[in-house]
Amino acid sequence: IVLFIQFGFAQKSSYSPYSYFGVGETNFSATADNKMMGGNTAYVDSVSVNLNVPASLSKLKFVNYSVGVNLKNNRYSTQDNNAKTTTASLNYLSVSIPTKRLGFNFGLKPNTSVGYLLESVDETTDPVSTNRYNGDGGINSAFLGIGFELFKNFGLGISSSYSFGNLNHYHSKILTDVELYTRVSSESSLSGLSYNFSAVFQQKFRNNIKIYSSYVYQPESSLTSKNSQSIRTLKLDGSFGGDTENINLSLTGMDETKFTIPSFSSFGLGFGLDKKWFVGLNFKSVQGNGYRNEFMSLDNVNFNQHNIYSVGGFYLPKFDSFTNFFDRVTYRAGFKY
């Protein structure tokens, strides 16, 4: 587990100017098969687990080991410049185990990531000055979930996550032809607990068609942020220039602050034929006023309530075919907005 946590800290999964805000760029946390269906949460079977729906563990019949790697390509453009970035990172690591009365799982997944480099040049000053903003870090979580069947076709689940990580933001002011420059470092170490509650329901109708439904609710939680800030003189090659001043944040009460993670609820609904096909939709609502930290607050930035819609499904020609490989392949498609 120590190796997993170290890897979680070491990876860099974002190169985005938007990761400057809040706790960074939010990771689309879902297994590969769920992602391919747009993030649908309704479908549950006996061999796979939905990491966002701990109630799916109530249907698990076989031990499940899951590892996911995320490859992301982004393109950013302004009136003057275009940029492309490619990042690869661990997306999830999970072990799920069924027992006679319930199923449980544990694992590690990254929640957010920070990675940006922004520069603005002021040629009206003498000497010309450059303001450089860069950052790194992110938040990961170690989770433990259980799911059990309360009634026939109806399962409940709960998961607990311990979130941890570091957010580092740096502001450098560089003057042309001046050997030294100053850099302000603002660093935060965050940790805290969150909980996730869910329910799943399945019912078989005519011609063995099944209706699948799910509900997920995660209440608002907070992370404790222990902060530090310093001003350092550096040489142009990045080496230490000789002066460092540590700012006493306790004088302003900024040495320890709270970071709010907003609540969300999600509802999924779909229908299909077991081991053959499935079509479903999902609705997720994330409350506003979250992702705010007094230590790194911005007056002109707000985090508002937003909704996410997704539709997806799969088709499996013949799951027990021994003669044709492509008949055993599951074809998935989906999108989210």
Q: Residue locations for each model-derived region?
A:
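Bacterial N-terminal signal peptides
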Residues: I1-Q6
